[in-house]
Amino acid sequence: MSSRKKVLLKVIILGDSGVGKTSLMNQYVNKKFSASYKATIGADFLTREVLVDDRQVTMQLWDTAGQERFQSLGVAFYRGADCCVLVYDVNNSKSFDALDSWRDEFLIQASPRDPDNFPFVVLGNKIDMEESKRVISTKRAMTFCQSKGNIPYFETSAKEAINVEQAFEVIARNALMQEESEEFSGDFQDPINIHIENDRDGCAC
């Protein structure tokens, strides 16, 4: 329906510094990869218009700094998010171990209405590197995702554009579902309680 309003979807991309968050965003939005990206300071965002199930939506992708000293910026950037993407480097076990704390950090800062059902997507990035350098297996990553409520999982390469489109397609769809559920529940935010007292001694006229 063309009369339906355009939807803005806010997607937060989290993960340790150097896992490729900025590269994934740039590959998805600009179809470009650069090996000389500087570390993100604070936060930055890119937008891309996409069609999700015949619905025109604008994806607003927020790339937040992975350094701990910038985590205090969280509240302003996380609030109003429709989906959170957790990124780690399959060749770096520390970045994988940090996923839990990034997820917890998001839930605390964003305070979603229904935290148990808030949509996350996990991306294991840099699969283009030599197999011998890989330290996190697909099985281990999937076990983690299943333990957190079957979070969708993709293995990606921003450099080679592997699974980037596919991953963001799922991210967009899940974000849209979240946005629509928030919209629906927002209609019933303040229920009206009607209490009728039956005055037996009063006039019935």
Swiss-Prot record:
Its main location: membrane. Alternates between an inactive form bound to GDP and an active form bound to GTP. Activated by guanine nucleotide-exchange factors (GEFs), and inactivated by GTPase-activating proteins (GAPs). It is a lipid-anchor. CDD domains: Rab7 (cd01862). Ypt/Rab-type GTPases are key regulators of membrane trafficking and intracellular vesicular transport. They act as molecular switches that convert between GTP-bound and GDP-bound states, and regulate virtually all steps of membrane traffic from the formation of the transport vesicle at the donor membrane to its fusion at the target membrane. In the GDP-bound state, Ypt proteins are predominantly cytosolic, solubilized through the interaction with a GDP dissociation inhibitor (GDI). Pfam families: Ras (PF00071). A motif (Effector region) lies at residues 37-45. Keywords: Cell membrane, GTP-binding, Lipoprotein, Membrane, Methylation, Nucleotide-binding, Prenylation, Protein transport, Transport. Signal peptide: none annotated. It comes from Neurospora crassa (strain ATCC 24698 / 74-OR23-1A / CBS 708.71 / DSM 1257 / FGSC 987). GTP binds at residues 17-23, 33-40, 66, 125-128, 157-159. This is Ypt/Rab-type GTPase Rab7. It is found in: Cell membrane. A lipid is attached at residues 203, 205 (S-geranylgeranyl cysteine). GO terms for biological process: protein transport; regulation of vacuole fusion, non-autophagic.
